[in-house]
Curated annotation (Swiss-Prot):
Pfam families on file: PNP_UDP_1 (PF01048)
One Gene Ontology term from the biological process aspect of the record: nucleoside catabolic process
Residue positions binding substrate: G78, I153, M174, E175
Phylogenetic placement of the source organism: Bacteria, Pseudomonadati, Pseudomonadota, Gammaproteobacteria, Alteromonadales
Annotated gene: mtnN
Naturally occurring in which organism (per UniProt): Shewanella woodyi (strain ATCC 51908 / MS32)
GO molecular function, one term: methylthioadenosine nucleosidase activity
Gene Ontology CC annotations of this record: cytosol
Name listed for the protein in its UniProt record: 5'-methylthioadenosine/S-adenosylhomocysteine nucleosidase
Length: 230
C-alpha cells in the first residue's frame, strides 16, 4: 500500500521526513515531494504550503504523479472542544469548508456548488487512526468535524458565528477540506488528523508560535503509528 502524507508547514512534516528510509526528493511547481519508506510502508511526504489553493495543487500533483492508494493530511489546528488540550488530536469524522457560502442557490452553508456538503474520510483509515491513539500515551484523541477556511481564526466574534453554523465543529484549519475535495474527485481514500496548536481565541497567535512544533510532532507520531495498522 502506497500512502501520500500532506502537511502544510515544515514542522508538520519534518519528523516524518527525518524518519524515512531510502528517501528521494523531487520538486514540482515549487512543492517538494519526498518518496521513501516509513517502517517498511511506501510513502510520499509533501509540504504543501498554507491554505486551500496550495493544498489543492499539492494534492493533485501527489495523486497524478505518485498514484497513492490513500492520502493522510497531518498537521496542526485550532481547537473548539473544551475537554481537549493543546497537543491533543482530532481525527476527522467529516470535513467541511467553513468559508463557503452559496446558500443563495440552495446549498448548505459551507457546501461548494456541485460538491457534497461534507467530505467523509475512509473508514479503514479512521479505524487505523483510532488504533494508533494508544501509542501516544497521555495524548487524547477524538473523532470530530474538522472545518477548513483561508483564515487563521483568533477572533471570538468570528468563532461564535462559526459555531452557530457548525455547532459540532471540533477543530478548524486551512487545508483539510481542499485536500478532501481533491481526494473525493479522484476517488482516493483520505483521512485528516490534526493536533491542536491553539484554541481559536485571542491567544491563538501566541499559542500557535509556541506549540506548532509540539502539535506537528504529535500529529507525525500519530501518522507513523497509523501506518503500522494498515
Amino acid at each position: 500500500m502506497k500512502v501520500g502524507i500532506i502537511g502544510a508547514m515544515e514542522p508538520e512534516v519534518a519528523h516524518l521526513i527525518a524518519s524515512m528510509d531510502n528517501a528521494e526528493s523531487q520538486t514540482i511547481a515549487g512543492i517538494e515531494f519526498v518518496a521513501g519508506t516509513l517502517d517498511g510502508k511506501e510513502v510520499i511526504v509533501t509540504r504543501s504550503g498554507i491554505g486551500k489553493v496550495a493544498a489543492s495543487i499539492a494534492t493533485t500533483l501527489l495523486i497524478e504523479k505518485y498514484t497513492p492508494d490513500a492520502v493522510i493530511n497531518t498537521g496542526s489546528a485550532g481547537g473548539f472542544v473544551d475537554t481537549l488540550a493543546i497537543g491533543d488530536i482530532v481525527i476527522s469524522s467529516e470535513v467541511r469548508h467553513h468559508d463557503v457560502d452559496v446558500t443563495a442557490f440552495g446549498y448548505e452553508i459551507g457546501q461548494m456548488a456541485q460538491q457534497p456538503a461534507a467530505f467523509m474520510p475512509d473508514e479503514k483509515l479512521k479505524a487505523a487512526a483510532n488504533k494508533a491513539v494508544a501509542s501516544l500515551g497521555e495524548v487524547k484523541a477524538i473523532e470530530g468535524l474538522i472545518c477548513t477556511g483561508d483564515s487563521f481564526i483568533c477572533d471570538p466574534v468570528r468563532t461564535k458565528t462559526m459555531l452557530e453554523h457548525f455547532p459540532t465543529m471540533a477543530a478548524c484549519e486551512m487545508e483539510g477540506a481542499a485536500i478532501a475535495q481533491v481526494c473525493h474527485q479522484f476517488a482516493v481514500p483520505f483521512v485528516v488528523i490534526r493536533s491542536l496548536s491553539d484554541n481559536a481565541n485571542n491567544d491563538s497567535p501566541v499559542d500557535f508560535d509556541s506549540y506548532i512544533v509540539k502539535a506537528g510532532h504529535h500529529s507525525a507520531l500519530m501518522v507513523m503509528s497509523l501506518l503500522k495498522h494498515l
